[in-house]
């Protein structure tokens, strides 16, 4: 069974570049080696940030590829856990991971480290390098 993953925006930005050492993570998604769990809030952030770091066309194409992929699962978290207090915007990823029963969130953001200290609900966070190692298994 495929692992279910929530990708923080900073990691999505790193894996989509054709010249990135993390590009295999994007290709693994396209090949169905993991399921990407997203919400409308997450897709909106992906679009906003991709438009800023690349352009509107790239943002549109990447978000469309995610939406249309059979390896994407959409979730609509109705309950907001508020587990990350330092950056409330990060909670959209946590809420999606909980509702999706995701195996983990992939993030390089230090704010997510607080989740290691919260016993319930348990949310695992992996760095991009750890995720890459998982994909090689």
Model-flagged regions — what are they?
Residues 59-67:
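Short, well-structured alpha-helical segments
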Residues 2-4:
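Extreme N-terminal starter segment of soluble prokaryotic enzymes
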């Amino acid at each position: 069974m495929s692992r279910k993953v929530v990708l923080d925006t900073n990691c999505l930005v790193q894996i989509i570049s054709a010249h990135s050492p993390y590009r295999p993570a994007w290709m693994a998604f396209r090949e169905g080696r993991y399921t990407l769990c997203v919400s409308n809030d997450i897709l909106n952030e992906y679009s906003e940030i991709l438009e800023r770091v690349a352009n509107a066309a790239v943002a549109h194409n990447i978000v469309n590829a995610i939406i249309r992929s059979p390896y994407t699962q959409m979730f609509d978290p109705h309950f907001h856990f508020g587990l990350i207090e330092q950056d409330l915007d990060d909670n959209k990823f946590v809420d999606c991971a909980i509702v999706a029963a995701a195996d983990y969130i992939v993030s390089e953001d230090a704010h997510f480290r607080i989740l290691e200290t919260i016993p319930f609900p348990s949310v695992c966070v992996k760095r991009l390098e750890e995720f890459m190692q998982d994909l090689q298994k």
